[in-house]
Amino acid sequence: MECALLLACAFPAAGSGPPRGLAGLGRVAKALQLCCLCCASVAAALASDSSSGASGLNDDYVFVTPVEVDSAGSYISHDILHNGRKKRSAQNARSSLHYRFSAFGQELHLELKPSAILSSHFIVQVLGKDGASETQKPEVQQCFYQGFIRNDSSSSVAVSTCAGLSGLIRTRKNEFLISPLPQLLAQEHNYSSPAGHHPHVLYKRTAEEKIQRYRGYPGSGRNYPGYSPSHIPHASQSRETEYHHRRLQKQHFCGRRKKYAPKPPTEDTYLRFDEYGSSGRPRRSAGKSQKGLNVETLVVADKKMVEKHGKGNVTTYILTVMNMVSGLFKDGTIGSDINVVVVSLILLEQEPGGLLINHHADQSLNSFCQWQSALIGKNGKRHDHAILLTGFDICSWKNEPCDTLGFAPISGMCSKYRSCTINEDTGLGLAFTIAHESGHNFGMIHDGEGNPCRKAEGNIMSPTLTGNNGVFSWSSCSRQYLKKFLSTPQAGCLVDEPKQAGQYKYPDKLPGQIYDADTQCKWQFGAKAKLCSLGFVKDICKSLWCHRVGHRCETKFMPAAEGTVCGLSMWCRQGQCVKFGELGPRPIHGQWSAWSKWSECSRTCGGGVKFQERHCNNPKPQYGGLFCPGSSRIYQLCNINPCNENSLDFRAQQCAEYNSKPFRGWFYQWKPYTKVEEEDRCKLYCKAENFEFFFAMSGKVKDGTPCSPNKNDVCIDGVCELVGCDHELGSKAVSDACGVCKGDNSTCKFYKGLYLNQHKANEYYPVVLIPAGARSIEIQELQVSSSYLAVRSLSQKYYLTGGWSIDWPGEFPFAGTTFEYQRSFNRPERLYAPGPTNETLVFEILMQGKNPGIAWKYALPKVMNGTPPATKRPAYTWSIVQSECSVSCGGGYINVKAICLRDQNTQVNSSFCSAKTKPVTEPKICNAFSCPAYWMPGEWSTCSKACAGGQQSRKIQCVQKKPFQKEEAVLHSLCPVSTPTQVQACNSHACPPQWSLGPWSQCSKTCGRGVRKRELLCKGSAAETLPESQCTSLPRPELQEGCVLGRCPKNSRLQWVASSWSECSATCGLGVRKREMKCSEKGFQGKLITFPERRCRNIKKPNLDLEETCNRRACPAHPVYNMVAGWYSLPWQQCTVTCGGGVQTRSVHCVQQGRPSSSCLLHQKPPVLRACNTNFCPAPEKREDPSCVDFFNWCHLVPQHGVCNHKFYGKQCCKSCTRKI
């Protein structure tokens, strides 16, 4: 007990932290030495060698000697090395193991049971140096255990017994790693153990780097296979600098990306069509599985890691680490039953083709993910997750060592292409890195990054390797991310039981041959990305440049995969673009895929376009192969029924879309402009209404737009395509003169004539009257003339060139058809319309000279047997149409109404249909299901500061709308994991300058009334000193004030003392003399010291006369000549004021021989005025109006902005404005 107490004193209590400084370490060392000395006599009495528990030199690691015990804790043996060598029977494999040892002042009893970390069909494959594959059946399957510590319900243990104990031990308060004691570490501490004992080192994560220094390889022991003492000193020496350099820096799980590297795409990650393909049967939801979820894991160790540990030891080491990972995923804080099962281990003695591994974690992971996606096991069986373990010191953003430990795609689990991680080997702590990176694959984000969990809580998903008192667990945020992932179909691969993968079949093609550069760009930048085709991109074998949006290409500075085509008959090999050569692939000619389904019609009426398309990807042309012959699209007209007469022209609709978009800073109303060259008919030209300019708003109109009015031809992909009268694309079928498609004019009767009459100029003259129903109308002058053709109705309404106003050439719609008016300087005028017209028209000529002759012709349908040809009578029927649902969820309605159709395709007025047959319609209920719950944020609170950065908060509420009800609050768990921001910064602008007051000085008097002062500075928001002129708008605080520290004690030596009399005011005759009463004290030398009168205010003044008459001598009776005249002054009068500066006056007379005289010299006259009481008057006390207060915390800013006169601000900020005044 004495030893245990000493040991407890040597180690700080939980949570107290390590000893600070060298002195602290020294105290611990001394205490430990003392402990060992005290315990020497009782060590033999402890069954499990308790002295080993005190053999460490600090609180991060101790030496222990485990012993095997039975379930009751009774000693069995010190020999714990046989457990991994004996082949166990099935019965033994199911039995439990017990070990016991002392550490950190307590007895630990481990109760262990076999772990299910390995699949029943687990195999090890070795890829040899010549590319050969070797399959091994490991003999270590029965030495991996998991369990707990007796008397600690929250503990967990995951260890390997293959060569001593190696693994993870987690207690309620701490987390330890255990492994056999390295010989060098024992030698350094001059530690030895009795024969047959097998000492181990139990250490915290903080000591991991130090422990690894003393190993030939991580996980090796003192006398175990693979241990080579001759190699250890060299290894220790070579890693000494590395340890000290990396001990503080190597703390990040996922590294930090340099600022110039691009951010990941914001859109959804690109997924190939077979990314989550099932194996033939539908998969259940992982989130609803009643059994545990199995992560069938492939582990790959690279060449550096195999060399580092040795081929004979690396398997045991890796499986020990994976057993620890399994234990971490079984921790109760994860909230789900996750079983990590290793189905296969691949050891790389050299890198296979297409797999590049170096310091650059991002590039290495990209290469590994591509490589492992092509691995296929027995019967096409695939693993769920692939883990790459590397001996490289990796870095997330450069091909040099740095502080990265692992790298992984977010939410990649179960994906064929993204369920993969890279992890740097750091010893047994590697288990935490693997658990962290696999957590990312499960969709987990770092704690504290976009979620409410704190970064430094000691959780597995913290950004850095810092535990909470050494304990790592899963945070509530990680649980939520995992729960969300398991509820998606993507997680379906985890539901099935582990199956035999067998030996993997390695791909016979390089990754770049399987996935071209466009696909690699999609993986990196999203579904819209493709290989950049800009000229500056030179070598994709060094950096793959991709194009996503706009005229900008971007890169993640990762090379294209091995085997990617980089030029004509060239491909990427080892970062170089080289010619195919003899080993290069043979040309593959492209073949078309199957035709797609028909697309939606581009128009709902008036003749739209739909298409089918196919792709030249079955296979794609590669390595100089030919592209597929023929077209990738076929088009067909659709919805050719005419639109309503009142509907807007299709081209006009497209122009109108730009009405709400600013054009060069202004908004216009746009109309179609069609007076363009023939080759520009399929561009969208629009004219600004009421302005004389037009503009090409788009390089091509929408598919199905007519090339020209009243023509069948339509625009498709910016090209005018021929359409026959039979409404077939590419058809040359035309209508005859009477409008019969593919007709021969046999149903037409033609009329024609010539008008040659001459008339007087500047008058309209009729040429021909053409009846309604006419077709193929053509009016043309025979020669060029100065006259003009005109058209009017029978009611004198002019459609063309009326009122002596000449119209420009162009198209003029009237009378049910469109007339094309042609006029040029070298060709005769011409009018043409296909018809039919719906009214009788009068064609005239506005005569301007000689009439050269006007030819006219038109056609009318023939009359059969006295009646025109029978026309089909239109049929009018009711049809039901319905709108879209009014809402997407929460219960809405579909409006249903009946419309009248002519011939089942044209909507007409309802009066054409029979009211008796009109169907009854009523709204339909739709989308009557609850909407997804969402976060409804409240209003932001008032900012906590008026300037210099404050905070404001708001409440959020999880609400949900149920069918036909108002939104109501629901449980927060129903809303998305990510919540809207609840706290935000506000009023970040700098505060205006303010007066800054220093502390008051000491009072100038220790008793009685004194004065104290303080310093005043003008300071800005950053506490910098500014000129006082910038603070003049603010009230200037007082710099001096009176102070009284206490009343002075009475001085018994003070007394009123009368001064000596003054001289008599007259030199002869009657005069006056005065004396003063002064507050005085007689000093030690007998001299009087005068004080202010207030010091004697408590002493009664003696009742003495202070003024009396005097008479030096009598004035002579007769004038005495030759006596000099002098000035005589009377006493000063009382001051006019008591403070602030007043005036005193007195009388001065010139006297000679006792009589007034004028003989005195004026420049000698004494002053008759003088200043008095010049001291400052005390400021009057202001009586503040109790109703004059500030209602807002920003009121002090109102005087600074000079708005106190404003009615609102002056009233609401009365106090601040009063101070300003």
Curated annotation (Swiss-Prot):
SMART domains: TSP1
Domain Peptidase M12B, chain residue ranges per copy: 293-498
Region (Disordered): 258-291
Position of sequence motif Cysteine switch: 252-259
Documented EC number(s): 3.4.24.-
Posttranslational modification: The precursor is cleaved by a furin endopeptidase.
Region (Spacer) residue spans: 750-876
Disease implicated: Microcornea, myopic chorioretinal atrophy, and telecanthus: A ocular syndrome characterized by microcornea and myopic chorioretinal atrophy. Microcornea is defined by a corneal diameter inferior to 10 mm in both meridians in an otherwise normal eye. In addition to ocular findings, some patients have telecanthus and posteriorly rotated ears.
Name of protein: A disintegrin and metalloproteinase with thrombospondin motifs 18
Protein's organism: Homo sapiens (Human)
